[in-house]
Regions:
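Nucleic-acid enzyme cleavage-core boundary/entry regions
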Residues: 1-157, 162-167
Length: 168
């Protein structure tokens, strides 16, 4: 309990930062798995976070991830990704992100993970965004958009299920 209380005092949100929850756990408990979901320490940590944020205890996995993110914590930043196309991203200085701009201009897909999204201030698009879960459908739509040079449609592919990177 003491370790969790100490960790709560060092949540990244206190410094307006973001950190991987495994790294956070390792720094404060010497165990990267200390705050894995379904552990007692995670349960205590989550209760402390909801207390500080003045929100109800989360009922779903998505709600848990949202609360963790508000506290400055996120799950695995690399494997938590989605694919996007024809979306423009802007950095913390409200400047176009050059990597995203290149994929946008060439009508190509970009796999975006949580670590990538940490440096994005906002994302803009055209008139519509189609969100699909199937990569083959995503690829077919992108080919059609590219072939016909349709500029007013953006795409997001969740690759089977909605993870937190797609939600953001």
């Amino acid at each position: 309990v003491y370790v969790v209380m100490k960790a709560l005092n060092h949540l990244p949100m206190w410094e307006n930062k973001k950190e991987n929850i495994s790294i956070f756990a390792s720094l404060h408990t010497k165990n990267p798995h200390a705050f894995d979901k379904n552990t007692f320490a995670y349960y205590l940590l989550m209760h402390g976070i909801v207390y500080f944020l003045k929100v109800d205890f989360p009922k779903t996995n998505l709600e848990q991830n949202e609360i963790l993110y508000r506290a400055g914590l996120y799950q695995d930043g690399i494997s938590n990704y989605c694919s996007v196309a024809r979306l423009q991203a802007f950095n913390e200085n409200n400047q176009p992100h050059l990597g995203w701009a290149g994929f946008y201009d060439s009508y190509e897909a970009l796999n975006v993970n949580m670590d990538n999204l940490l440096h994005i201030h906002f994302i803009t698009c055209c008139n519509r965004v189609y969100i699909v879960e199937n990569p083959s459908v995503f690829q077919a739509l992108l080919k059609k958009i590219k072939k016909e040079e349709i500029e007013k449609i953006g795409l997001v592919c969740t690759n089977g299920q909605l993870n937190y990177s797609a939600y953001l």
